[in-house]
Regions:
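NAD(P)+-binding Rossmann beta1-loop-alpha1 motif at the extreme N-terminus of oxidoreductases
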Residues: 1-49
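A general structural motif
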Residues: 23, 71, 95-97, 125, ...
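Short, charged/polar "capping" segments at the starts of alpha-helices
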Residues: 34-39, 108-111, 167
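Short mixed-charge
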Residues: 43-57, 123-125
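Rossmann-like NAD(P)-binding element
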Residues: 51-101
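Rossmann-like NAD(P)(H) cofactor-binding subdomain of soluble oxidoreductases
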Residues: 80-142
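Internal alpha-helical scaffold of NAD(P)-dependent oxidoreductase catalytic cores
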Residues: 142-172
Length: 172
């Protein structure tokens, strides 16, 4: 699977490392290049806790077009107050239909994301889902390191179109 992780904070680093460790091709995007400068040069996230080791990430970028070049799934790991801006940015730059999961979306985040996305892009419809919370209890300890204290046994997830839920869960 080709996954794009949006956001290089606590949960973004954890998710990128976990997906890569699982054999997926991972692109990690962050709006600020300075936040990812060290990872950009090494392509490694250092993990401790539930996931341990130095985990290689295929692509690290602050170029949204590169990040959205051909993902099978887009995982947004930023705070909810950035979702509207990201929906617009993704809508203006993505060139395929895929699954976008807000981690977390919580309170109608997927609905706001959908409405914003659709204002800017109707050519590439997206399946948009949100989780109740992030699956990791984690802390970014340095620019390129994350401590994953725990991974939750389950997290609620739903697409705006609930008929898609089984497919999304199977995919994840």
């Amino acid at each position: 699977m080709k996954a794009t992780v949006i956001g290089a904070g606590n949960s973004g680093l954890a998710m990128a490392a976990h997906l890569s460790r699982g054999g997926n091709s991972v692109t990690l995007w962050n709006r600020s290049g300075s936040t990812i400068s060290r990872i950009s040069s090494t392509h490694v996230i250092h993990c401790e806790g539930e996931i341990q080791g130095d985990i290689r990430i295929d692509t690290i970028t602050d170029d949204i077009r590169l990040a959205l070049k051909d993902p099978d799934i887009v995982l947004v790991t930023t705070p909810a107050n950035s979702h509207r801006e990201l929906a617009e940015l993704i809508a203006k730059n993505i060139r395929k239909s895929t699954v976008i999961v807000l981690n977390p979306g919580r309170t109608l985040g997927a609905l706001e994301f959908r409405r914003t996305y659709d204002r800017y892009n109707t050519e590439y419809p997206q399946t948009i889902a949100e989780t109740q919370t992030i699956i990791y209890t984690c802390r970014k300890t340095t620019e390129d390191s994350v401590h994953i204290m725990a991974m939750k046994d389950s997290v609620l997830i739903s697409a705006l179109d609930a008929r898609m839920n089984k497919d999304i869960i199977r995919y994840l």
